[in-house]
């Protein structure tokens, strides 16, 4: 059975985090990621004499498994890792974590149990098939773990990881495409764990030649392991200080590269350590020397010097580089004059693990620099600061945010409040200040109140006109909802529908019904074109989702009112939640995997990590792809209807009991003495009281309650038997499912129904926005000042009359 991506992720993280104890995540990651590496290379290469990695005798994960429970497990695990490291030139890479460190891993039995359980987590994973279909499950799992470790590590220790969403943006805006050759070079001077380099390399069909330098020893090891896990075994990753001792040089010059990406440490205060910028042997600071206590521009200047004359780079830096003065202003002015800066993308705040401050992407393009230097071309700016989702205590870019940024930047689209081309003259007029809000107004217009409408009543026509995008699609709906008032000045309308009925009126309007139907047409056409029934073993899920998601995006290009990126996000969310697991399973094991049920086995004393779908004779089962509800809906709807009726009957009886107890169970009620110690009523407590009762009314009440209890017990018994009968029928139905039935259940009943339902929800959300705005306007101006004054006067007269009647006025 194929491993589900989400199963790998959740199992690894939950289990590893459980074993972490009090250890800092920044330290524990070294143990977990080393173990993942050992498991992968052992599964992948132990029987491959010509593989990229040699697995020596006594140096495999299998040897670790044999150590579970061994009193010397820590020392022996270190020796196993050392053998693999020695055989592959990986000393100082995979042997960084000390598995015999009792201070971190505990002593005695605690140490043995912790390592034995850690090995046991990975023992259950078969990673031999990773990348066999061109999809990097393991690399993605590695990145998933790093994301979580970065989140847990806190502000000072999470800088080794650039969020994959940001990496994807950089990879897609520097010009790597299907025509980029394998010998094209990509370089990251502050490569961290290497995820940014790998994202760029993945954009080329055959990969790129990778170079990276990283100052931190443990992080360099992470990067080297990451390269191997992603199949980039030829990557050249070097440990060292890029600014003071750049490793990649040719003669007395810096080596130059086709592409450069980087997320260097923000505002490094020690960037001059080991370096005299005034006499830099590589002439990196020709355009100016950055401030001694702020190294942002030091990295940018190093990148520019390291680019070929046709090279393109993208670097993540804090927003301050766009507008800070003094030395940085001088450097910025020189870079603009040289035309090096092609564009700037402003990102949301709090995306990165090392800092919460907002950052930007500066894109350097030497190939087109001359036209910008002459003023023939401008500098393209994007303000993407408002497109994100909350993810715990961080912000995170969604798939739609990434796609929009990339689309807009690569096509240089001018979108109001989001992006525009800024000419050199305008930048000069702003004294070379590149602060994005100077050029793009992304603020939301304040909702203005109309004083005349508050005084005289009516909804301002200007407010109704502001909904013009709706009226273009629903012109007659406007006439249905509003009519013009004829008081002074005109320009005001009244709402013809009660405030509480506005949404219903919109939904029932013929134009809306037509709009809703037409909004589903692109989806229906797209669905027919996806040909998901043609998925076969060996297909590449990542290629599939790329193809169908791009097609869906294109089909909603001109759909009125709907945002094509919102529709795209619906598909990508469902892909992450469920669809990718289904497709991965089918691509590895075929459609028949849909008929499989997996028995859930849990060790004694442990809890189930998954909720069972079926329980048959006390044995718990998990459906791999098709939940029982889908089989029930298609094949056992009558039986389910019967169960629903039985449940309703039981609910009625239970409600009757609750009402009866509420009526007679208070302190002076007939059932007052029938409650148990906890104050509740059950068959035992009522029978006990019945033996002592002498009052005929009390006896009758007790017997009535017992009769209700009997009815409830019988109803529960009948319901339980019916449910067990249905569960057994469904259980027996799974093995009878043929490929055609599985495809129908998955494609139509699960995938199509879910996606269509969510798009219908999006259509309704758009409608709700219109209805809510109209309701807001109607209620805002419902009581003009004159009406309020009249009401106050009327109430005053009533009070005066009452006072007179009382003789006090």
Locations of regions flagged by a protein language model:
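Extended, highly charged linker/hinge segments and catalytic-adjacent loops that couple domains
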Residues: 259, 270, 276-278, 378, ...
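Active-site lining segments that contact anionic ligands and/or coordinate catalytic metals
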Residues: 256-257, 294-296, 310-316, 338-342, ...
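Conserved S-adenosyl-L-methionine
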Residues: 156-262, 267-288, 297-298, 317-320, ...
């Amino acid at each position: 059975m194929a491993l589900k991506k989400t199963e790998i992720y959740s199992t690894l993280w939950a289990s590893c985090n459980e074993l972490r104890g009090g250890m800092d995540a920044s330290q524990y990651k070294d143990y977990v990621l080393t173990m993942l590496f050992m498991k992968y290379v052992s599964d992948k290469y132990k029987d491959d004499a010509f593989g990229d990695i040699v697995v020596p005798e006594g140096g495999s994960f299998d040897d670790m498994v044999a150590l579970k429970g061994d009193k010397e497990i820590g020392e022996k695990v270190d020796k196993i890792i050392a053998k693999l490291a020695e055989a592959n030139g990986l000393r100082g890479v995979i042997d960084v974590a000390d598995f015999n460190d009792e201070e971190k891993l505990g002593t005695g039995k605690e140490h043995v149990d912790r390592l034995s359980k850690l090995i046991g987590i990975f023992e259950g994973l078969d990673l031999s098939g990773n990348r066999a279909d061109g999809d990097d499950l393991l690399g993605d799992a590695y990145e998933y773990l790093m994301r979580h470790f970065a989140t847990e590590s806190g502000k000072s220790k999470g800088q080794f990881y650039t969020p994959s969403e940001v990496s994807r943006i950089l990879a897609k805006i520097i010009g790597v495409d299907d025509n980029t050759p394998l010998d094209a070079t990509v370089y990251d001077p502050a490569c961290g764990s290497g995820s940014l380099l790998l994202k760029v390399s993945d954009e080329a069909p055959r990969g790129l030649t990778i170079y990276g330098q990283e100052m931190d020893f443990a992080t360099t090891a992470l990067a080297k392991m990451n390269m191997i896990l992603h199949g980039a075994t030829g990557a050249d990753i070097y440990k060292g200080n890029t600014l003071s001792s750049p490793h990649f040089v040719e003669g007395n010059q810096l080596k130059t590269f086709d592409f450069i990406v980087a997320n260097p440490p923000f505002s490094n205060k020690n960037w001059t350590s080991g370096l005299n910028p005034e006499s830099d042997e590589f002439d990196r600071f020709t355009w100016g020397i950055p401030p001694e206590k702020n190294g942002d521009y030091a990295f940018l200047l190093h990148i520019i010097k390291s680019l070929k004359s046709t090279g393109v780079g993208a670097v993540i830096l804090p927003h301050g580089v766009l507008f800070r003065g003094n030395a940085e202003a001088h450097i910025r002015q020189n870079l603009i004059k040289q035309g090096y800066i092609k564009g700037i993308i402003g990102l949301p705040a709090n995306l990165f693990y090392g800092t919460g401050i907002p950052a930007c992407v500066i894109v350097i393009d030497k190939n087109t620099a001359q036209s910008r230097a002459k003023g023939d071309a401008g500098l393209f700016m994007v303000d993407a600061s408002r497109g994100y989702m909350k993810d715990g205590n961080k912000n995170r870019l969604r798939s739609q945010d990434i796609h929009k940024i990339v689309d807009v930047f690569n096509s240089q689209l001018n979108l109001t409040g989001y992006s525009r081309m800024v000419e050199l003259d305008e930048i000069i007029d702003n004294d070379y200040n590149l602060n994005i809000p100077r050029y793009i107004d992304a603020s939301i217009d304040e909702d203005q109140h109309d004083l005349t409408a508050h005084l005289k009543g009516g909804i301002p026509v200007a407010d109704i006109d502001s909904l013009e995008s709706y009226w273009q699609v629903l012109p007659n709906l406007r006439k249905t909802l509003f009519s013009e008032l004829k008081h002074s000045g005109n320009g005001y309308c009244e709402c013809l529908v009660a405030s509480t009925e506005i949404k219903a009126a919109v939904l029932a309007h013929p134009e809306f019904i037509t709009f809703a139907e037409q909004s589903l047409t692109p989806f229906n056409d797209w669905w027919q074109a996806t040909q998901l029934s043609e998925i076969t073993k060996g297909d590449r899920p990542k290629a599939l989702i790329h193809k169908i998601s791009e097609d869906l995006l294109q089909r909603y290009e001109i759909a009125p009112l709907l945002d094509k990126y919102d529709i795209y996000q619906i598909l990508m969310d469902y892909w992450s939640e469920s669809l990718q697991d289904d497709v991965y399973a089918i691509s590895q094991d075929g459609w028949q995997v849909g008929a499989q049920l997996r028995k859930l086995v849990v060790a004694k004393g442990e809890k189930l990590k998954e909720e069972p779908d079926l329980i048959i004779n006390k044995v718990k089962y998990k459906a791999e792809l098709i939940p029982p509800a889908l089989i029930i809906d298609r094949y056992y709807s009558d039986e389910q209807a019967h169960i629903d009726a039985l449940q309703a009957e039981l609910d009625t009886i239970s409600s009757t009991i609750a009402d009866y107890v509420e009526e007679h169970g208070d302190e002076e009620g007939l059932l007052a003495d029938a409650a148990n110690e906890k104050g509740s009523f059950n068959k035992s407590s009522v029978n006990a009281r019945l033996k002592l009762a002498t009052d005929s009314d009390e006896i009758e009440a007790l017997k009535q309650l017992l009769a209700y209890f009997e009815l409830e017990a019988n109803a529960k018994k009948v319901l339980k038997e019916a449910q067990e009968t249905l569960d057994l029928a469904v259980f027996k139905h799974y093995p009878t499912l043929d490929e055609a039935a599985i495809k129908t259940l998955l494609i139509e009943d699960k995938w199509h129904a879910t996606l269509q339902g969510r798009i219908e929800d999006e259509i309704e959300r758009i409608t709700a926005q219109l209805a809510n705005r109209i309701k807001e306007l109607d209620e805002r101006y419902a009581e003009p000042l004159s009406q309020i004054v009249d009401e106050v006067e009327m109430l005053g007269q009533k009070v005066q009359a009452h006072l007179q009647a009382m003789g006090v006025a």
